């Protein structure tokens, strides 16, 4: 899983590794999109990094599959609060751009060593996901290339219309 890699790093993951992981994740998410699948729980614990360097997306347990209309369970948002998209956190309709938001949150953590939003309660984190902008990554990691920061912030736009439209 990617989680041990994040925990093993003193602060942040090497930018070349982040870029490679981002490209591989985008390929995986694009394949999901082409098959009509929305993962809905993209987070480090659901990404396997094989010894060969290949990544595998795991845990499609709450994925939205093609031709299913339910996007929430009993009107509750599902997913992991630290990586959940604002629309998913609000119980609104989601599409593949929700997974891109989650990927952006993961990348943010990789390059800064911090979650984009953190609070003691899950409810507070959800409210931050919906209402607050993250601290710009370069404020936490000044050596981060501006282009990579822009990619992360675009993926984490609150409004899906302003995010990347596909992986």
Q: Whereabouts are the PLM-identified features?
A:
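AlphaC helix of the protein kinase catalytic domain
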Residues: 1-13
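Activation segment signature within eukaryotic-like protein kinase domains
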Residues: 21-22
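Protein kinase catalytic-loop region centered on the HRD/HxD motif
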Residues: 27-37
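Activation-loop N-terminal segment of eukaryotic-like protein kinases
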Residues: 49-53
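Pre-DFG segment of protein kinase catalytic domains
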Residues: 56-59
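Conserved activation segment of eukaryotic-like protein kinases, specifically the C-terminal portion
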Residues: 74-84
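C-terminal lobe helix-coil module of Hanks-type protein kinase domains
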Residues: 82-167
């Amino acid at each position: 899983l990617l989680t041990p890699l994040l925990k093993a790093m003193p602060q942040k993951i090497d930018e070349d590794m982040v870029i490679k992981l981002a490209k591989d994740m985008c390929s995986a998410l694009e394949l999901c999109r082409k098959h009509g699948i929305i993962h809905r729980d993209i987070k480090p614990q659901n990404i396997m990094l094989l010894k060969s360097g290949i990544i595998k997306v795991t845990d499609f347990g709450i994925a939205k599959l093609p031709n299913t209309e339910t996007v929430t369970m009993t009107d509750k948002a599902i997913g992991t609060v630290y990586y959940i998209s604002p629309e998913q956190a609000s119980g609104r309709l989601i599409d593949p751009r929700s997974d891109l938001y989650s990927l952006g949150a993961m990348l943010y953590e990789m390059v800064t060593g911090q979650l984009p939003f953190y609070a003691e309660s899950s409810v507070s984190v959800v409210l931050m996901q919906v209402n607050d902008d993250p601290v710009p990554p370069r404020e936490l990691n000044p050596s981060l290339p501006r282009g990579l920061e822009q990619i992360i912030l675009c993926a984490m736009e609150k409004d899906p219309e302003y995010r990347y439209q596909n992986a």
